Amino acid sequence: MKAKAKGVKIVVCLSLVMVLGVAGYAAKEMVKYEIHDMTRPNPPVITPPAQVGQPPSDAIVLFDGANTSEWVSEKGGGEVKWIVENGYMQVAPKAGGIRTKRPIGNCQLHVEWCTPEGVDPKITDQKRSNSGVILMDRYEVQVLDSYTENNYKDNRTYADGQAAAIYGQHPPMVNACRKPGQWQSYDISFLRPLFGEDGNLIRKGRITVLHNGVVVHNNLEIEGTTAHKQKAKYSPQKEGYIHLQDHGNPIKFRNIWIRELPEEPYLIK
């Protein structure tokens, strides 16, 4: 049908209700504008960070180096037992993993991490400073010391389990690891999977990852829940949390923030 508003070409009302975590999305209106249409709303104005890697004005800071108030223990949701000092938090022995207090779906996530220096060169594979960043309780971006000086002859693991891999699914396009003891960064854009009211998968999750500023996954489809030596598959999910994994190694984390991203209007014909 034709729109009455000037410059608006098509208006389509969507009546599909899809459960997307905390809130349901219903009756979305998709509007197609003319080129250079002055009736098209401008985006919100934010203040960008003064330095790359710092949070913009619309970010939610999950860890600023001072305390773990945005986190709880995976063990029953209690107080975090990790070490907090010198602007970072560090996995403590037998403390267990941690997760955010708030559920988080579509997001831009920045997290910095550091593996211990002085590692015994005989320790390789998955024992080499292992951790992970897990999205919505299920989808893991691997944290590991995958630094190599001679094309993996000194330090090798399976490709879909090295640093920045979507664990058990997709290796990174390149190995952008820094040396042990040096701070590294992940910048992640995550689009959550969608499920219908009947529990069937409507859309797979998608992810883009920059490791130390280098694109290692580009709008990649996630195949399902992270699993060890099992084929990934999806199961219905309403919401989930960001986790930092305790794999028995003293990994450090700092400067963690997110920007919650809106769901794109989704048209079902």
Residue spans for each PLM region:
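Bacterial N-terminal signal peptides that target proteins for export
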Residues: 2-12
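Residue-identity detector for glycine
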Residues: 7, 21-24
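N-terminal leader/targeting segments
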Residues: 2-3, 20, 28
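Bacterial N-terminal signal peptides
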Residues: 13-21
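Carbohydrate-interacting regions of secretory-pathway proteins
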Residues: 24-269
